[in-house]
Regions:
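RNA substrate-binding interface of SAM-dependent RNA methyltransferases
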Residues: 2-116
């Protein structure tokens, strides 16, 4: 069996396009109060400092903005984005389809990411 060439899409058919990888994404969840939340430097600075973590490392808003930018881009509208992979700082990798609709508000985005 022959290995797929780099220009083949994820389903195995030759196709041009782009694959984006968001590396070291800070999408860490923690139990804050009654439920789980995505940690971020604006809402949880005291929690992060209490646990010996640098609040500057917790910026899920950057991931949110990048996903919106990629999925709203002319490249995606032209059908040239094949996939977006998000690799978190906790070594979790997941794929986001180019047809996915990312919530416009950061709060709803965090709510969705907690459910994953």
């Amino acid at each position: 069996m022959e290995a797929p060439s780099p220009d083949e899409d994820l389903e195995g058919t030759p196709e041009e396009g782009f694959i984006f990888v968001l590396e070291k994404a800070s999408l860490e969840t923690a139990k804050v109060g009654k439920g789980y939340q995505i940690l971020n430097c604006d809402d949880h600075p005291n929690f992060l400092r209490r646990h010996g973590k640098d609040p500057a490392d917790y910026r899920p808003d950057i991931v949110h903005q990048e996903l919106l930018a990629i999925l709203d881009s002319p490249l995606n509208k032209a059908g040239l984005v094949k996939a977006v992979f998000v690799h978190t700082s906790k070594n979790v990798l997941f794929r986001i389809s180019p047809h996915t609709r990312i919530p416009r508000t950061f709060k709803r985005f965090c709510g969705l990411m907690v459910q994953l």
